[in-house]
Amino acid sequence: MSTNRRILTKKTENISNFINNYHSDVINEVEESITNNRVVVVGMAYNPHVSKVNKVLGEQGVQFKYLEYGSYFSMWSQRLSIKMFTGFPTYPQVFVDGTLIGGCDDTIKELNEGTLFNDLKKK
């Protein structure tokens, strides 16, 4: 059974083009970072969940690339473009080896379970 919501799986060509071209410079920067770095955190200033995941990854010795797009009152349209592109509604957005694993809680869960990050930690 698919976990995608049915309404989100059907888009017209115009909608798909809009999503793909809305702040394409930002999307290209995120995609390039995901391609060139094993772990990427996409976030925003002053967000406690973003701060927490950055702190926890650092404490665990996981090297990561951090991309910050504004704060609560700036760059909202750029953050919206990332949300539309990934389909994930909140920040941070954490990518490991090119795969979106989720946000802060998901990342901490993966760290605690040791499923994704063991080989990424500094010895």
UniProtKB/Swiss-Prot annotation:
Cystine crosslinks: none
Glutaredoxin domain sequence ranges: 27-123
GO cellular component annotations of the record: mitochondrial matrix
Keyword annotations from UniProtKB, A to Z: Electron transport, Redox-active center, Transport
UniProt-listed InterPro entries: Thioredoxin-like_sf
Protein family membership: Belongs to the glutaredoxin family.
PANTHER family: GLUTAREDOXIN 2, GLUTAREDOXIN-1-RELATED
Protein name: Glutaredoxin-like protein
Species of the source: Dictyostelium discoideum (Social amoeba)
Gene name of the record: grxB
